[in-house]
Amino acid sequence: MPKKKLIGEVVSDKMDKTVVVAVSTLVKHPRVGKYIKRTKKYYAHDENNECRDGDIVEIIESRPLSKLKRWRVLRIVERSVFADETLDEELEGGSSDDN
């Protein structure tokens, strides 16, 4: 049986080798018939700490890696603009607003 794959947005990268990915889906309300947006969070393993907040990533099902982690980051689909700016600041050695 093939492993499940999901695409979502990284909402937290504060942990070592772990990211929290929010995956949104549309679910039809049984009585009203209106589509409702549902969001679920998944803890995913990020081996090289490459993911940053706001990145769009693809995750794949895996064996249990810890109490909460059952997913691995397969690839980064799209980098966030915010993540690129903070990475540039870190490389420069701080904020450029210092007077």
Curated annotation (Swiss-Prot):
Disulphide connectivity of cysteines: none
Stored InterPro entries: NA-bd_OB-fold (IPR012340), Ribosomal_uS17 (IPR000266), Ribosomal_uS17_bact/chlr (IPR019984), Ribosomal_uS17_CS (IPR019979)
GO cellular component labels: cytosolic small ribosomal subunit
UniProt GO BP: translation
Keyword Cell cycle listed: no
One Gene Ontology term of the molecular function aspect: structural constituent of ribosome
Keyword Ribosomal protein recorded: yes
Highest taxon of the lineage: Bacteria
UniProt KW keywords: Ribonucleoprotein, Ribosomal protein, RNA-binding, rRNA-binding
Record function comment: One of the primary rRNA binding proteins, it binds specifically to the 5'-end of 16S ribosomal RNA.
Oligomer and partners: Part of the 30S ribosomal subunit.
HAMAP family xref list: Ribosomal_uS17_B
Family (UniProt): Belongs to the universal ribosomal protein uS17 family.
Protein name, UniProt field: Small ribosomal subunit protein uS17
Organism: Thermosipho africanus (strain TCF52B)
